[in-house]
Amino acid sequence: MLVLISVSTVAVIATFPVSQKDEAKLAAQSLFQRIQLINEEAILSGRDFGLRVDDLNRAFLFVELSEDGWKKLEKRQFGSELQLPSELVIDFQLGGNAWVKDERMFDPEPLFDQEMFAEKKQLPPPQVYILSSGEVTPFVVSIHPKQSPTESWRIVVEENGQIRLFAPGEQDEKA
């Protein structure tokens, strides 16, 4: 049933001629539903998934952990890539203090040239992990039109795994 809902959502989103504000809303709703669907799939199937966010190219890529490393999610019913129109902007922020890079004691760069021994190119690891245990990396994604950053739709994934969608102007009750 969840597959039917996600497929119908993607089909509906693709057929509407909409304004920039509506495009931001539809893109945020589509991403929100995909994250929820992948989270449920991870728990039910016992597999681990991830999400790569490319805010410069306005793209989201869902990946799956296999024996060979991270690979693009190949599901016929589920679009593994979400490309936003050029009129929209993505603001992506990982949650939690563990992801702050400014106060690291050591440089995260490898000591050795890993390219020398590399066998084949793999996808880089995702920024967001969606694990079979129900854990999800906390993050916030804001999607808004270029001309109106105040019309921002936010997807908030909290440390407890709760996934929420906020409309422009809507505030978190905890804040």
Q: Language-model segments: which ranges?
A:
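N-terminal helix-rich module
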Residues: 10-17, 26-30, 40, 48, ...
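Alpha-helical hydrophobic helix detector
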Residues: 1-13
